[in-house]
UniProtKB/Swiss-Prot annotation:
<protein>
    <recommendedName>
        <fullName>Phosphoglucosamine mutase</fullName>
        <ecNumber>5.4.2.10</ecNumber>
    </recommendedName>
</protein>
<dbReference type="GO" id="GO:0006048">
    <property type="term" value="P:UDP-N-acetylglucosamine biosynthetic process"/>
</dbReference>
<dbReference type="GO" id="GO:0005829">
    <property type="term" value="C:cytosol"/>
</dbReference>
<feature type="binding site">
    <location>
        <position position="243"/>
    </location>
    <ligand>
        <name>Mg(2+)</name>
    </ligand>
</feature>
<dbReference type="GO" id="GO:0005975">
    <property type="term" value="P:carbohydrate metabolic process"/>
</dbReference>
<dbReference type="InterPro" id="IPR005843">
    <property type="entry name" value="A-D-PHexomutase_C"/>
</dbReference>
<feature type="binding site">
    <location>
        <position position="245"/>
    </location>
    <ligand>
        <name>Mg(2+)</name>
    </ligand>
</feature>
<dbReference type="Pfam" id="PF00408">
    <property type="entry name" value="PGM_PMM_IV"/>
</dbReference>
<dbReference type="Pfam" id="PF02880">
    <property type="entry name" value="PGM_PMM_III"/>
</dbReference>
<dbReference type="InterPro" id="IPR005841">
    <property type="entry name" value="Alpha-D-phosphohexomutase_SF"/>
</dbReference>
<keyword id="KW-0479">Metal-binding</keyword>
<feature type="binding site" description="via phosphate group">
    <location>
        <position position="102"/>
    </location>
    <ligand>
        <name>Mg(2+)</name>
    </ligand>
</feature>
<keyword id="KW-0460">Magnesium</keyword>
<keyword id="KW-0597">Phosphoprotein</keyword>
<dbReference type="GO" id="GO:0008966">
    <property type="term" value="F:phosphoglucosamine mutase activity"/>
</dbReference>
<dbReference type="GO" id="GO:0004615">
    <property type="term" value="F:phosphomannomutase activity"/>
</dbReference>
<dbReference type="Pfam" id="PF02878">
    <property type="entry name" value="PGM_PMM_I"/>
</dbReference>
Length: 445
């Protein structure tokens, strides 16, 4: 992979007010992106955002930079990331830009791009944008400046698109669903989709104030959702992250259902319906239980690097149509071009309705192995993963697992973290082993 200065695995991200998430940087980024994208002919860009208070500031900066490069911006307002990908395709825009830091706290924000076909920008285009950033900013002639406009009923367009992925002969009548929108971009989308399909919806995490996005709610913290599902005696709960590209579910007993289990349900249903093409793609973090369960069904399984862009790349290479991360990014290429929490949820609900089974029962064919993830923050210049003591302890743990588990150490693509994952048959042992490795990483971080 190339050494890009600003772009990580999911665009550009950081703390608001610190480089690169500053108004001047984002203005320059908009200009540089405009210069690169204008070479392809179209001069229209779609811009969406989540509900962070900083979105207004960054949206204005992006628009100014694009206009200076001669490109026009069409705004969606607060909108899920996958909605921007969809609108980019339907409006035949040269690119879509999302202002979001996904599951991060409100004081972070980020910028990510979609190409004209609704997929993430290729590495070479991101590299070209970074190269343009090194040049002095110049403004086009006044007659060539870009304009700004707002897309009429962007939410309604996307709601109808989502509903179109649910079988027309079915409805959600009789289902009680709790939905947690993380005070994020799905707050005005997901409840409407589910209600219009017939469900009784209890909505939480749907009162964004600019600073409560992902705060003890949504896909990264389902405790509120679990409690509400039990209190309401609901059939199922759906939790999205701040920008709506992740889905975590909760069954009627209050059990969390993660991206691995969601992928299993969708793959199994695709096989049952005779619609599964090839196999399923997970990641290095996918639970061994998923691999075992799919193998029992005769469904091929492959692991990509962590990051939804790498899941998508492997899906495209293999010609497979479904893939997911255990964090809840679920990509269904027969339905859309990127991870989409609402659409993934609708496919699981389809399986519930068609099979007359609860979410709990749909998960019963897959047994999760205990998996412990410890995040260790590092600030030093030395790479903890290259340290010999860390490597030795990791090797010792791998020997102890003796092929009945896995160890994975990796750097986060979006934060200064080392992620330590240990997976095995016995939870107490796995916890102790993960902490041993994490302590070794901390000692050299």
């Amino acid at each position: 992979m190339s050494n890009r200065k600003y772009f990580g695995t999911d665009g550009i991200r950081g703390k608001v007010g610190d480089t690169p998430i500053t108004p001047d940087f984002v203005l320059k980024l908009g200009w540089a992106a405009g210069k690169v994208l204008a070479r392809h002919g179209s001069r229209k860009i779609i811009i969406g955002k989540d509900t962070r208070i900083s979105g207004y500031m960054l949206e204005s900066a992006l628009e100014a930079g694009l206009a200076a490069a001669g490109l026009s911006a069409s705004f969606t307002g607060p909108m899920p990331t996958p909605a921007v990908a969809y609108l980019t395709r339907t409006f035949r825009a040269e690119a879509g830009i999302v202002i979001s830091a996904s599951h991060n706290p409100y004081y972070d924000n980020g910028i990510k791009f979609f190409s004209i076909d609704g997929t993430k920008l290729p590495d070479d285009v991101e590299e070209a944008i970074e190269a343009e950033m090194e040049k002095p900013l110049t403004c086009v002639e006044s007659s060539e400046l870009g304009k700004a406009s707002r897309i009429v009923d962007a939410a309604g367009r996307y709601i109808e698109f989502c509903k179109g992925t649910f079988p027309g002969e079915l409805s959600l009548n009789g289902l009680k669903i709790v939905v947690d929108c993380a005070n994020g971009a799905t707050y005005h989308i997901a409840p409407s989709v589910l209600r219009e399909l017939g469900a009784k919806v209890i909505a939480i995490g749907c009162e964004p104030d600019g600073m409560n996005i992902n705060e003890e709610c949504g896909a990264t913290d389902v405790r509120q959702l679990q409690a509400r599902v039990l209190a309401e005696k609901a059939d199922v709960g759906l939790a999205f992250d701040g920008d709506g590209d992740r889905l975590i579910m909760v069954d009627h007993l209050g059990n969390k259902v993660d991206g691995d289990q969601i992928l299993y349900i969708i793959a199994r249903e695709g096989l049952r319906q005779g619609q599964l093409r090839g196999g399923a793609v997970g990641t290095l973090m996918s639970n061994m239980g998923l691999e075992v369960a799919l193998k029992q069904l005769g469904i091929p399984f492959a692991r990509a690097k962590v990051g939804d862009r790498y899941v998508l790349e492997m899906m495209q290479t293999k010609g497979w149509r479904i893939g997911a991360e255990n964090s809840g990014h679920v990509i269904l290429l027969d339905k859309t071009t990127t991870g989409d929490g609402v659409i993934a949820g609708l496919q699981v609900l389809t399986a519930i309705v068609k099979n007359h089974m609860s979410l709990h029962d749909l998960c019963s064919g897959m047994k999760l192995f205990p998996q412990i993830l410890v995040n260790v923050r590092f600030t030093g210049e030395n790479d903890p993963l290259e340290d010999k003591s860390v490597q030795q302890i990791t090797q010792d743990v791998e020997k102890e697992l003796a092929g009945r588990g896995r160890v994975l150490l990796r750097k986060s693509g979006t934060e200064p973290l080392i992620r330590v994952m240990v997976e095995g048959e016995h939870e107490e042992t796995v916890i102790a082993q993960a902490n041993r490795i994490a302590d070794a990483v901390k000692a050299v971080s």
